[in-house]
Amino acid sequence: MRPNTTIGKTITIDDLFRDGYKSVFIGAGLWKANAMHIKGESLGNVAFGIDYLANSKAFRLGDDVAVIGVGNSAMDCARTAIRNGARHVTCYARRDESCISASEYEVSYAKLEGVGFRFCKAPVEIREDGLICRDTVKGEDGKFTQVEGSETFYPHTGVIVSVSQGSESNLVKTTTGIETNQKGLLSVSEDGRTTREGVFAGGDAVMGARTVVEAVAVAKKVAVAMDEYMKSLPADTAADPYADIPVFQTPTSDVLAKQQL
């Protein structure tokens, strides 16, 4: 095991194959916060959900917090904000209530703890004292569009942006032959094979944000495929070119001298 090592920066997947690994499993998950790219996201009263959950005590968001998003992470952020002293917490969603992605369990407990919800509101700007949203309407095609001229200002002391997470792009950018889909998730076969031979993947990096139970179930299935793949590879008969080189022996006197120093 080699901890505290980021693959995709100094060390790449290509380096792993060079150093003798026969297959690689990517289970990096989605730990990079997605931004909305609207004005005000860099203000001091704004936190990204994944950063807030990692160290909520580091943020000073006041007693009236807006949470943008209605997924499981957004529910965690809302409930954590209440535990940190916020008196009012409101979740905002671009679509209607039927489109909540959080589990019913998470939503029900958030409501019990006092979390409010505003639906069909699309944030267009964050300010130090709140956020500006436009109303959205559902079209015949099922898509929600913003209503021009419907802007409304909602006062808040702090804002948490929790609109899902993305994968770390360096892993893909530095590895030849790996393809992703339109959402930036890794493209794999049913048994977890990516488009690069010997590279397998599973979990959130493939399915999007899911539960730990689902990720573990997929990982077990992919592990079987990896084992079968490695067993199918021809035996490595290449001789070690440095097998017969001399081994330097440190003189005992040098060791004693260093110890005395």
How should these model regions be labeled?
Residues 1-39, 124-133, 158-160, 165-171:
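Feature captures the FAD/FMN-dependent oxidoreductase FAD-binding
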Residues 2-4, 47, 116-118, 132, ...:
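General small-molecule cofactor/ligand-binding pocket signal
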Residues 4, 61-65, 86, 120, ...:
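Phosphate-coordination loops involved in phosphoryl transfer and adenosine-cofactor binding
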Residues 42-62, 144-209:
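FAD-site-proximal beta/loop scaffold in flavoenzymes
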Residues 59-87:
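Rossmann-like NAD(P)H-binding beta-loop-alpha module
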Residues 70, 93-96, 204:
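Cofactor-binding loop segments of dinucleotide-utilizing enzymes, especially the Rossmann-like FAD-
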Residues 202-232:
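A conserved FAD-binding loop/helix module that cradles the flavin
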